[in-house]
Amino acid sequence: MILVLDFGSQYTQLIARRLRESGIYAEIVPFFESVENIQKKAPKGLILSGGPASVYAKDAYKPSEKIFDLNLPILGICYGMQYLVDFFGGVVAYANEQEFGKAILEIVQNSVIFEGVKIKSLVWMSHMDKVIELPKGFTTLAKSPNSPYCAIESDKIFGLQFHPEVIQSEEGGKILENFALLVCGCEKTWGMQHFAQREIVRLKEKIANAKVLCAVSGGVDSTVVATLLHRAIKDNLIAVFVDHGLLRKNEKEKVQAMFKDLQIPLNTIDAKEVFLSKLKGVSEPELKRKIIGETFIEVFEKEAKKHHLKGKIEFLAQGTLYPDVIESVSVKGPSKVIKTHHNVGGLPEWMDFKLIEPLRELFKDEVRLLGKELGVSQDFLMRHPFPGPGLAIRILGEINENKIKRLQEADAIFIEELKKANLYDKVWQAFCVLLNVNSVGVMGDNRTYENAICLRAVNASDGMTASFSFLEHSFLEKVSNRITNEVNGINRVVYDITSKPPGTIEWE
């Protein structure tokens, strides 16, 4: 196992992900993790991440100096390398010629860390400081046009000024793999088959004969959680799916069919009337979210009580992922709010369940791989993200059944055409928004005054930033024609070409 010490870089999670993609298990801890805790984890090597600070600043992030007493191989990346240089007596200073973006790395000295790596390759830089003078005992391994010391080595200690974890670094994955396998002696033992087998055994031991309540949204995380739990505890899993009437077209039926194929009993609650009655007359986005969250808890509580009376429920399953765990112990200290799974936060006191989080070690892409390992269909696993409040935040203004139906039909056409054109898997997320404006149109010889639909499609890697998708005009024309001809009450279709930032992906 490789342990990554986080100094606050936006790329830290990518380090662990790249290693895991190579079959090497990696964990992330804050830079101030105690040496005692590091020893308990028994890593075979340490990686010091990048970070936004300068090593010569008064408040610079610095780990315990005792990490060097562990006699472990260490790789410093960007700030991590500069910390190593500063600690061992070298000089780091503000760079007059800073490097951001792509640069050419040229290897000038053979090293095990560059085994099988091209002499010249593209790398990703992001630094304002640079190494001016190496400490005694360090050797230069590589350079870039503006960094004479772009990679350095001293015995089992290595430094890289660039970011090998970023996909733009052509040989970055190979370099990280070399450090883990050839320097640290790790083995490729990490994978979802191994994880599934281990986790099923662990869940059986932890839960025994107790009952577990799991809220299912129809999304990837909750479906994989339910599938994993069912493999472990069979019918002691109580999976609850709340239909709030704000789902995509045929969503309920698709979720039910999926769980039937997986042979997992699913308790479906039709709460459409309850939700829509409480949302009547509400147009403010945050109030919509609040009402949906509170109503979900009421409905979920009522259903939980029924099962609680039949046999005490001891556990509540949540789809916490590894990024949530990292966030809670970030370099800035514990977060004030830990994200909970779907709408399960704020449950009443009587529901004093123990939490069980089977996915807390996994990244999102690993959850999909685990789902595939467990037999969840690929089509289901690769579906686009869908917000917890559902179509409520894609209908601008007040919500009613007619608006929901219009949006469901338009959205289904858009998604269907994306799949026909083999575009669905090429965009990160696509959906329709029902605008709260009417516009004048002409159909036949008649004047119309009807709703407008907005098409939204974006490309992204994680949703933190996004750019609108460049869809062909002929494709957009086809979708527009179908929607205006097939969906009653729609006479205009527009395409959103806003990126994030300045806009958000969802409209509300």
From Swiss-Prot:
Signal peptide: none annotated. The keyword Nuclease does not apply. GO terms for molecular function: ATP binding; GMP synthase activity. Its EC number is 6.3.5.2. GO terms for cellular component: cytosol. Coiled coil: none annotated. ATP binds at residues 217-223. Residues 190-383 form the GMPS ATP-PPase domain. The keyword Repeat does not apply. InterPro entries: Class_I_gatase-like, GATASE, GMP_synth_C, GMP_synth_GATase, GMP_synthase, GMPS_ATP_PPase_dom, NAD/GMP_synthase, Rossmann-like_a/b/a_fold. It is an enzyme of class 6 (ligase). Keywords: ATP-binding, Glutamine amidotransferase, GMP biosynthesis, Ligase, Nucleotide-binding, Purine biosynthesis. It catalyses: XMP + L-glutamine + ATP + H2O = GMP + L-glutamate + AMP + diphosphate + 2 H(+). Catalyzes the synthesis of GMP from XMP. PANTHER family: GMP SYNTHASE [GLUTAMINE-HYDROLYZING] (PTHR11922:SF2), GMP SYNTHASE-RELATED (PTHR11922). This is GMP synthase [glutamine-hydrolyzing].
